[in-house]
A protein has these predicted regions:
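Conserved aromatic beta-strand anchor motif in extracellular beta-sandwich/beta-rich domains
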Residues: 8-12, 97-99
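Aromatic-rich carbohydrate-binding modules that target alpha-glucans
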Residues: 20, 79, 84-131, 141-179
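Solvent-exposed segments in extracellular or luminal domains encompassing
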Residues: 20-36
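Exposed beta-strand face motif in extracellular beta-rich ectodomains
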Residues: 33-37, 132-136
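Conserved structural position at the C-terminal beta-strand
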Residues: 41-43, 140
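Edge beta-strands of extracellular beta-sandwich domains
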Residues: 46-56, 149-150
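An acidic, Gly/Ser/Thr/Pro-rich helix-cap/linker signature
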Residues: 57-80, 135-215
Length: 215
């Protein structure tokens, strides 16, 4: 209770302040891109921060998906700077890909396209560095959700080969998983690890020359 100082930030930039008020309101209009807000409330020596986001519908994003793509990560065999993501999310309205490659602030450039035939969402990532680890997750939006369910769900790729978890990873000893990639600070829920230009696994001759024993 009582007066407090308010500082509202949008994508890390302060857009409105009020040095002393007991009830804070602010209206921002003409929002055309995704915004991550932080409201810092200072009262005496106590600071409370509230976070929330506004996700903009990118509109019609229909485009035929290239052939021979499968659900999950599709690595480009001839260009290690590219990878194509495919997500099957029936009845969802739109999907953004948020990741380390866009500082977890996806714009229209990372709004997934929707294949008109299969209804699957897909997006080609470009500008990747071969051998580097990237993390990402899908922001799946239902514009008219069922009562009691969220309009947006953040989820790792269901076909991930490596997932980082803010809940489980701290309990994994280095002896069990050496050099486990670090979960990205400030994110929510599980994320997928993507790496182009991986060195193919060297199978032993015992495996490649295995002969099935007779019954």
């Amino acid at each position: 209770n009582g007066n407090a100082s308010y500082n509202l930030k949008s994508n890390g930039v302060s857009i409105h302040t009020n040095a002393s008020t007991s009830s804070y309101t602010f209206t921002q209009s003409n929002i055309t891109s995704n915004q991550n807000y932080e409201l810092e409330v200072l009262q005496g020596t106590t600071t409370i921060t509230k976070k929330f986001s506004v996700i903009v519908n990118p509109g019609a994003n229909t485009q035929a998906m290239p052939t021979n793509l499968v659900d999950g990560i599709n690595y480009n065999s001839t260009d290690a700077t590219k990878a194509t993501l495919v997500l099957d999310a029936p009845l969802k309205d739109f999907v953004y890909v948020a990741g380390s490659f866009n500082n977890w602030q996806p714009t229209n450039a990372h709004a997934m396209l929707k294949d008109p035939t299969t209804g699957k969402f897909w997006l080609e990532l470009t500008g990747l560095t071969s051998g580097s680890n990237y993390t990402y997750q899908y922001w799946v939006v239902d514009a008219t959700p069922i009562a009691g369910t969220p309009a947006m769900v953040k989820t790792a790729d269901p076909y991930s080969t490596l997932v980082l978890s803010p809940y489980d990873d701290p309990t994994i000893p280095a002896a069990s998983y050496p050099n486990l990639p670090v979960y990205p600070t400030g994110q929510e829920r599980e994320v997928t690890v993507l790496q182009t230009g991986q060195t193919p696994y060297a199978w032993s001759t015992a495996t490649t020359n295995f002969v099935k024993p007779a019954k």
